[in-house]
Amino acid sequence: MAKEKFERNKPHVNVGTIGHVDHGKTTLTAALTRVCSEVFGSARVDFDKIDSAPEEKARGITINTAHVEYDSNVRHYAHVDCPGHADYVKNMITGAAQMDGAILVCSAADGPMPQTREHILLSRQVGVPYIVVFLNKADMVDDAELLELVEMEVRDLLSTYDFPGDDTPIIIGSALMALNGEDDNGLGTTAVKKLVETLDSYIPEPVRAIDKPFLMPIEDVFSISGRGTVVTGRVERGIVKVQEEIEIVGLRPTTKTTCTGVEMFRKLLDEGRAGENCGVLLRGTKRDEVERGQVLAKPGTIKPHTKFEAEVYVLSKEEGGRHTPFFKGYRPQFYFRTTDVTGSCELPEGVEMVMPGDNVKMVVTLIKPIAMEDGLRFAIREGGRTVGAGVVAKIVE
């Protein structure tokens, strides 16, 4: 069978289901593929296939994730669903599956539960920008007042973590009903169609990497006689054009220079674009004035910082992480983009130690500044071995 060509004519949006165990995330995921396959002709995926999600490795961390795709009238959605709570924690912290928006599934019969809260908090910490709510199992609730109560609780919870609780769309329905092709009182297929329409209208189209301001992490520095200094790396976002002014940020005081050439596979180009590996020739910059671990960026778009609040997942012993807990004052290396920088960890009030397999919020102080912004991912290493993964939740200074 010939492979289908991937059609790129619709905007691509990444979403995922979050919420407490057994509230119906996987059932809703399967129902979404069923309803969209009937309405918009995308492929249907069965519950069992999603539920037995394959193991993946992201940065040495084992995560079980199911990936499904479905189409609406105007968009193509890539959707992630994780079987276990630990998988969500790892997934969100490592950014293995970055979400442009999340579907919070909450059982109308049970209301918000501990993981409902934790997933909302994680979404805030790792920078999931939008949440849409699906109040599931509504066919099991006869009392309209109870539904209203649960809806209020969910809105309060969202507001607690700085999401717009009052304005968040909440769809009431039954994923199981929709999965079985039923639709009593519009709670089945109608509710799921409404959910898809809400995703279309409430989650804005993400800005593509190429439309963001230029940034390239420096991997290597060369000196070419008669030409000057060339730095190489993969352009993370944006475009760099010849004769544009750029900044060198991180590790040392920020300096300005001009890009006098872009090279790729020994060919000279006028520009380097997001996703490309290229060499950038820097005017008047000496070989020893720039190093791996710094970034080239559009002037004024990114600043160097040393202190930040982070959400961290500590690898378990089975994942090749530490065998013992660590305590406050722990000083590992933090690997940002292309380099390690030593830093010290301050644990939250009342947390004495962190065990392998835990996730924890911490404040990190680095010994050298790194070009960073909220949402930047990093690894925690000890002598080159990865022992944790984290994300910058909030820059302190």
From Swiss-Prot:
This is Elongation factor Tu 1. Its EC number is 3.6.5.3. It is found in: Cytoplasm. Residues 60-64 are annotated as: G2. The lineage of its organism: Bacteria, Pseudomonadati, Pseudomonadota, Gammaproteobacteria, Pseudomonadales. Residues 136-139 are annotated as: G4. Residues 10-207 form the tr-type G domain. It catalyses: GTP + H2O = GDP + phosphate + H(+). It comes from Stutzerimonas stutzeri (strain A1501) (Pseudomonas stutzeri). GTP binds at residues 19-26, 81-85, 136-139. GO terms for molecular function: GTP binding; GTPase activity; guanosine tetraphosphate binding; translation elongation factor activity.
